[in-house]
């Protein structure tokens, strides 16, 4: 026997060279339990996906509902507020109809009536503001068709073109929305209005 080079075998004869055996991975025959496990894993993944989608949908629904409730609180009185604005306009017209000399007259009954109408108008505007309805008077502003309604053009060269020269009726906003646009006269003469920065 020789050393462990593998040149000779136990009988002393030269050993035949042996090629190394490459083993292939063992493939188990199809096991019904593995198929069932794969099916269960697939069902679990689908259930997780459905659960995540349902949770996301519920969160979106919660946010949308909260936004709709907020909008309903803010804008729900729009129809009522429009009707009340007509009353406010009539009170203002009544005050505007009183001549200046009649206001200065010493008649205490007339003064009390004028003060009563003024207090009523102020109280009405305070109630509207309490509910988010705000009056705006755009005199001197650049004309914006989103919040102004042009009724006519004013030929005044001292006012830049496209500027609100006269306000016929004030506008009202509720939250960020226009409840009623301001009725205005827009300047058509003079220098161009500077673009807002």
Swiss-Prot record:
GO terms for cellular component: cytoplasm. Its main location: cytoplasm. Pfam families: GrpE. It is found in: Cytoplasm. It comes from the Bacteria. Residues 1-12 have a biased composition (Basic and acidic residues). Keywords: Chaperone, Cytoplasm, Stress response. CDD domains: GrpE (cd00446). SUPFAM superfamilies: Coiled-coil domain of nucleotide exchange factor GrpE, Head domain of nucleotide exchange factor GrpE. One of its GO terms (biological process) is protein folding. GO terms for molecular function: adenyl-nucleotide exchange factor activity; protein homodimerization activity; protein-folding chaperone binding; unfolded protein binding. InterPro entries: GrpE, GrpE_coiled_coil, GrpE_head. HAMAP family: GrpE (MF_01151). Participates actively in the response to hyperosmotic and heat shock by preventing the aggregation of stress-denatured proteins, in association with DnaK and GrpE. It is the nucleotide exchange factor for DnaK and may function as a thermosensor. Unfolded proteins bind initially to DnaJ; upon interaction with the DnaJ-bound protein, DnaK hydrolyzes its bound ATP, resulting in the formation of a stable complex. GrpE releases ADP from DnaK; ATP binding to DnaK triggers the release of the substrate protein, thus completing the reaction cycle. Homodimer. Belongs to the GrpE family. This is Protein GrpE. It comes from Nitrobacter winogradskyi (strain ATCC 25391 / DSM 10237 / CIP 104748 / NCIMB 11846 / Nb-255). The gene is grpE.
